[in-house]
Each structure stands twice: as C-alpha cells, then as structure tokens.
Design a protein with these regions (language model features):
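Positively charged n-region of N-terminal signal peptides that target proteins for export
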Residues: 1-8
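Intrinsically disordered, low-complexity serine/threonine-rich segments
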Residues: 5, 21-22
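Acidic, low-complexity intrinsically disordered segments
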Residues: 22-180
Length: 180
C-alpha cells in the first residue's frame, strides 16, 4: 500500500513538472561593464544585458546606486526591445523619495516578442565625486508572451569615480634636470 502511494505521488509530481510552461526558464540581467572607471564630471552609459531568452514580452527592472557619487541622467530600452521591428513601450519611473538613488524602467514589446541575448536597457549617469559607487540590482522581473515569469536573476557592478590628476607643465630642459 505504501509503495503504491509513493508511486502515485511520483507520477503526480512528474506530471506537474512536465506541464510547466515550456518557455519559462531562468534569465539573467547584469550590468556591463561590471567594473569601470570614470572621471569626475563625466557622463557615461552602463548597459543592462540579458542572456539568451527566446520569448521576452516585458521587463521591469530597478538598479540602486550611490546618490552621493552618481546622478541618474536617463534609462532607456536597449536593442533587445527596440530592434527587430514591431512597436515597443518604455517608461522610466523616477525615484521620488530623497535621495534619488534608484533607476527604474518598465519596457514591453507591444506586438511580437523580443529575443536575447543583448542589451535590455541603457542606464546613463553623471559622475559627481571621487570614490566607489556600487550599482546593485534591486528588482528584476521578465515575462514571456504567456505572462509567465522568466524568474530572472541579476548581478550588479561597481563604478570607480576618479579625481582628475593635476598636470604640471615643464619644458624639456626642466624634465632633464629633474630626472638627474
């Protein structure tokens, strides 16, 4: 009797796992480059990349950053959603709580689906003061055309903001004397 119950339970579990959505699989979002150095005052762009996804309909993502070191300029949809024809929608959600330290983006393919790998979003920052500024994933949600979550994982990065180095002007003769 006990063996029959175990066998029945195993059959039910096997049936449930085989009935799961076939397109649903874990996806990964990551910041690229994961480690970069910029100068104070520079405006630069980080890419939010996604791995191979065959059926991507929409994404909501949020990335936390150091508001003392970085200022968010913009966050826009990447080529995963914008290339390949078809209409798409994007909406940058502004962080209204002080300090503004989160970049949010909703993006969806309106007709058809998107495919990865590629750039899912571009995040543009301005470097404010020297130091290390981690960029961390605080929210990642990706859905396929059946509205099934792709259960995305995500990994952040770090931006090293460097202070400008002073340039000393010397003539060739001064350099020769200084080097001796």
């Amino acid at each position: 009797m006990f063996r029959a119950q175990c066998a029945a339970l195993c059959l039910v579990l096997a049936a449930l796992t085989s009935c799961a959505a076939p397109g649903a699989r874990a996806a990964v979002l990551s910041i690229s480059p994961a480690d970069t150095t910029v100068q104070v005052g520079a405006t630069f762009t980080l890419r939010v990349t996604c791995d191979a996804v065959s059926d991507l309909k929409g994404m909501q993502t949020a990335w936390g950053y150091s508001a003392t070191r970085l200022q968010l300029v913009s966050m826009t949809a990447g080529n995963v959603f914008t290339d390949g024809g078809g209409a798409w929608f994007e909406h940058m959600i502004f962080d209204v709580s002080a300090p503004a330290d989160t970049a949010w983006l909703d993006v969806a393919k309106l007709n058809g689906t998107a495919q990865g790998p590629g750039v899912a979003a571009y995040v543009r920052f301005k470097a404010l003061v020297p130091g290390d500024a981690p960029v961390q994933c605080t929210l990642a949600e990706m859905r396929d055309s059946d509205n099934v979550s792709l259960l995305p994982g995500c990994s952040g990065g770090i931006v090293h903001v460097a202070a400008p180095t002073a340039i000393t002007r010397r003539s060739w003769g001064q350099l020769k004397i200084h080097a001796r």
